[in-house]
C-alpha cells in the first residue's frame, strides 16, 4: 500500500544560496573569460604573426640594401656569391629560406643549391617585382611558409631584383600556441580567484541573511504578508527616521489611504503620519506609548506604538491601531449580552418567588386564590414579556430591551415598546451592534433627561419594512434647547454639561457607516423624538 507523504517532503526545494551564487558567478566568469580569451588570443595571433613578418622584412630590407647583393645581381647566378651571404644570414636568423631573384624571377640563392638559376615558384612574388613589399602565406619546394618580399634597387633607384624570405608556418603556429597557453593559465587563475571571491561573498551574504536560504526568506515574507493582511487591526511600521516602510490593508482602510504608483517609499503617507502620530519619543527613548486616542480624518482611533530593536539598537517603531468605534461596538455588544443575562437572572428570581407563592397556596389548599394568582401571573407575563418576545425576534435585542425596561422601572419611569413594533432576527452582527449602540444611547439619554423625579415615560417603536429598520425613541422630558438641536450630533455638544457629548456623535457615525440616517425633533418642555433608519437583513436571514 502506498503511503502519501507530506507536501513539504514531496516538494522539491530550490538549490542553496551558496550553490546558486557559485554556479551563476562561475557561469558569468567563464563566459567573460572565454570571450576575453578568444579576443585576446586573436589579437595575440595577429601580433605574433605580424611580429615575425616584420622581423623577416627587416632582414629582407637589410639584404636589399647590401652592396654585395646589388653587385652580385650584375653577374650570373652561379658566379654572384649571393648564395653564401644568404645562407649565412638564413642560418643565423633561423629562417626557412632566403631567395634572391633578378627581375626575371631567376634564383640567385636557395637552401638547395641545385635550384639556383631556376625560376621562383609562386605568383606571390609579382607585387615585389612591381616594386611593392608583400607578405603572403604560400607553399614552395620546402614547406608551407610565411613569405615576405622586398624589392632591390641599384644606386640609380632602378629595381634590379627581389629578396624573398620564408618563415616555416609551423614555427609561427608554435609561437602562437605558446602564447595561447599563457592566456589559458591566466584565464584559469582568474577563474580560481573569482571562485574564492564568490565563496567569501556567499559567507558574507549568509551572515547578512541570518543564515536563511532565499526560499526560506520568501516563505517568511509571504507568511508575514498574509498575517499582516489577515488581522483586522491597522499596522504601520516606520524606520529610525520616521519614514513609513509598511502599511497593511486594514490601516489603509482606516486611514482612507491608497498607495498610488507615484508614491515612492510611501513618502506622502510618511509626512502625514508623522504629523498625526509622534513617534520621535519612541524612537529616541524606546518608551512605548499605549492606548492613545487620536482622531484621524474624523475617526477616533486607539493606538499603541512600540519600538523595534535589533541587537539592542532602536531601528524603528510599529504602531497598531483600531477604530475605537469598533472597540465600543464590541463593548456594547457584550453589554447587550450581559443585559440579556441580567434580565434572565432577574426573571428567574422573580419566577422563583412566584413558585414559592404557588407552593405556599398549595400547602394551604387555597385553590381559588391559587387559580386567581396563576391567571394574573400568566396575564402579566403575556403583557410584558410574551408580547415583547412575539414582536422582537432577536434574542439579544429582546434581552437588551427587557434590561432597559427593568432599569427604567427601577428609576421610577416607564419604558414601553409600541404595540405595532416588529423586528425580525438578523444575520448581521454589525447591524445588531449598531442597533444596541443606538437604542442604548438614546434610552440612557432619555432616562437622564427625565431626572430623578418619577413618572416619566419613554416609548420605543421598531418597524421593519423592505430591508430597512425604522426606529423611534420618544420621551416626555424637558426637550432640547433650539440653539443646540442643530448641533446635537456634533462631538462635544451636550445638554448635560461639559466633557460630555460623545455618545450621539458615535451613534451618528455608526449609523451612517451602515448607510443609515438619524434625525431629531424636540419641543422644549414637552417631548424629544429621535428617528433612526438603518439597513436590516431581516428578510434574507428569515427565509
Swiss-Prot record:
Chief subcellular location: membrane
TM region positions: 21-41, 182-202
Subcellular location: Cell inner membrane
Cellular compartments per GO CC: plasma membrane
Pfam families: HATPase_c (PF02518), PAS (PF00989), sCache_3_2 (PF17203), SPOB_a (PF14689)
Keywords: ATP-binding, Cell inner membrane, Cell membrane, Kinase, Membrane, Nucleotide-binding, Phosphoprotein, Transferase, Transmembrane, Transmembrane helix, Two-component regulatory system
Keyword Nucleotide-binding carried by entry: yes
GO terms (BP aspect): regulation of DNA-templated transcription
Catalytic reaction annotation: ATP + protein L-histidine = ADP + protein N-phospho-L-histidine
Listed InterPro entries: HATPase_C_sf, His_kinase_dom, PAS, PAS-like_dom_sf, PAS_fold, sCache_3, Sensor-like_sf, Sig_transdc_His_kin-like_C
PTM annotation (Phosphohistidine): residues: 349
Cytoplasmic compartment spans: 1-20, 203-543
Post-translational modification: Autophosphorylated. The phosphoryl group is rapidly transferred to DcuR.
Its EC number(s): 2.7.13.3
Residue ranges occupied by any PAS domain in the UniProt entry: 212-323
Annotated membrane topology: Multi-pass membrane protein
Binding site for (R)-malate: 107-110, 121, 140-142, 147
Membrane side Periplasmic: residue ranges: 42-181
Residues covered by the Histidine kinase domain: 346-538
PROSITE patterns: HIS_KIN, PAS
Quaternary structure, from the entry: Homodimer.
Description of its domains: The periplasmic domain is involved in C4-dicarboxylate binding and sensing. The structural disorder in the cytoplasmic PAS domain has an important role in signal transduction to the kinase domain and may be the decisive structural feature that characterizes the activated kinase.
Functional summary from the UniProt entry: Member of the two-component regulatory system DcuR/DcuS. Involved in the C4-dicarboxylate-stimulated regulation of the genes encoding the anaerobic fumarate respiratory system (frdABCD; nuoAN; dcuB; sdhCDAB; etc.). Weakly regulates the aerobic C4-dicarboxylate transporter dctA. Activates DcuR by phosphorylation.
Alphabetized PANTHER family for the sequence: SENSOR HISTIDINE KINASE DCUS, TWO-COMPONENT HISTIDINE KINASE
Protein's name according to its UniProt entry: Sensor histidine kinase DcuS
Amino acid at each position: 500500500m502506498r503511503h502519501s507523504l507530506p507536501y513539504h517532503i514531496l516538494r522539491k526545494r530550490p538549490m542553496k544560496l551558496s550553490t546558486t551564487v557559485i554556479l551563476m558567478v562561475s557561469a558569468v566568469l567563464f563566459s567573460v573569460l572565454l570571450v576575453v580569451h578568444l579576443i585576446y588570443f586573436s589579437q595575440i595571433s595577429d601580433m605574433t604573426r605580424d611580429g615575425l613578418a616584420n622581423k623577416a622584412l627587416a632582414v629582407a630590407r637589410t639584404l636589399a640594401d647590401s652592396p654585395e647583393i646589388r653587385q652580385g645581381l650584375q653577374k650570373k647566378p652561379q658566379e654572384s656569391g649571393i648564395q653564401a651571404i644568404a645562407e649565412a644570414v638564413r642560418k643565423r636568423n633561423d629562417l626557412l629560406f632566403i631567395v634572391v631573384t633578378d627581375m626575371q624571377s631567376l634564383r640567385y640563392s636557395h637552401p638547395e643549391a641545385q635550384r639556383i638559376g631556376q625560376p621562383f615558384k609562386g605568383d606571390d612574388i609579382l607585387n615585389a617585382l612591381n616594386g611593392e613589399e608583400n607578405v603572403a602565406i604560400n607553399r614552395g619546394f620546402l614547406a608551407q611558409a610565411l613569405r615576405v618580399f622586398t624589392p632591390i634597387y641599384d644606386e640609380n633607384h632602378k629595381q634590379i631584383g627581389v629578396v624573398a624570405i620564408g618563415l616555416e608556418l609551423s614555427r609561427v603556429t608554435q609561437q602562437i600556441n605558446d602564447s595561447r597557453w599563457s592566456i589559458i593559465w591566466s584565464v584559469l587563475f582568474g577563474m580560481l580567484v573569482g571562485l574564492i571571491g564568490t565563496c567569501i561573498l556567499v559567507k558574507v551574504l549568509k551572515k547578512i541573511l541570518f543564515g536563511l536560504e532565499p526560499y526560506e526568506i520568501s516563505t517568511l515574507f509571504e507568511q508575514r504578508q498574509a498575517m499582516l493582511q489577515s488581522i483586522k487591526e491597522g499596522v504601520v511600521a516606520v524606520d529610525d527616521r520616521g519614514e513609513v516602510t509598511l502599511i497593511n490593508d486594514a490601516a489603509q482602510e482606516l486611514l482612507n489611504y491608497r498607495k498610488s504608483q507615484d508614491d515612492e517609499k510611501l513618502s506622502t503617507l510618511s509626512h502625514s503620519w508623522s504629523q498625526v502620530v509622534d513617534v520621535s519619543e519612541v524612537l529616541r527613548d524606546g518608551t512605548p506609548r499605549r492606548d492613545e486616542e487620536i482622531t484621524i480624518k474624523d475617526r477616533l482611533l486607539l493606538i499603541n506604538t512600540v519600538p523595534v530593536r535589533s541587537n539592542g539598537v532602536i531601528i524603528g517603531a510599529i504602531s497598531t491601531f483600531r477604530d475605537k468605534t469598533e472597540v465600543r461596538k464590541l463593548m456594547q455588544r457584550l453589554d447587550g449580552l450581559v443585559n440579556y443575562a441580567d434580565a434572565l437572572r432577574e426573571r428567574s428570581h422573580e419566577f422563583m418567588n412566584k413558585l414559592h407563592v404557588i407552593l405556599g397556596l398549595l400547602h394551604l389548599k387555597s385553590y381559588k386564590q391559587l387559580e386567581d394568582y396563576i391567571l394574573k401571573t400568566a396575564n402579566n407575563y403575556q403583557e410584558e414579556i410574551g408580547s415583547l418576545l412575539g414582536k422582537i425576534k432577536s434574542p439579544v435585542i429582546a434581552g437588551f430591551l427587557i434590561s432597559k425596561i427593568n432599569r427604567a422601572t427601577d428609576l421610577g419611569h416607564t419604558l414601553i415598546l409600541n404595540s405595532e413594533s416588529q423586528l425580525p432576527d438578523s444575520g448581521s452582527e454589525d447591524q445588531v451592534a449598531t442597533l444596541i449602540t443606538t437604542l442604548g444611547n438614546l434610552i440612557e439619554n432619555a432616562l437622564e433627561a427625565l431626572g430623578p423625579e418619577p413618572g416619566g415615560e419613554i416609548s420605543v417603536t421598531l418597524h421593519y419594512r423592505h430591508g430597512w429598520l425604522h426606529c423611534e425613541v420618544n420621551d416626555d422630558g424637558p426637550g432640547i434647547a433650539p440653539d443646540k438641536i442643530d448641533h446635537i450630533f456634533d462631538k462635544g455638544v451636550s445638554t448635560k454639561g461639559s466633557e460630555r457629548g460623545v455618545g450621539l456623535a458615535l451613534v451618528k457615525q455608526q449609523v451612517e457607516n451602515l448607510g443609515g440616517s438619524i434625525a431629531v425633533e424636540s419641543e422644549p418642555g414637552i417631548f424629544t423624538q429621535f428617528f433612526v433608519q438603518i439597513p436590516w437583513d431581516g428578510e434574507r436571514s428569515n427565509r
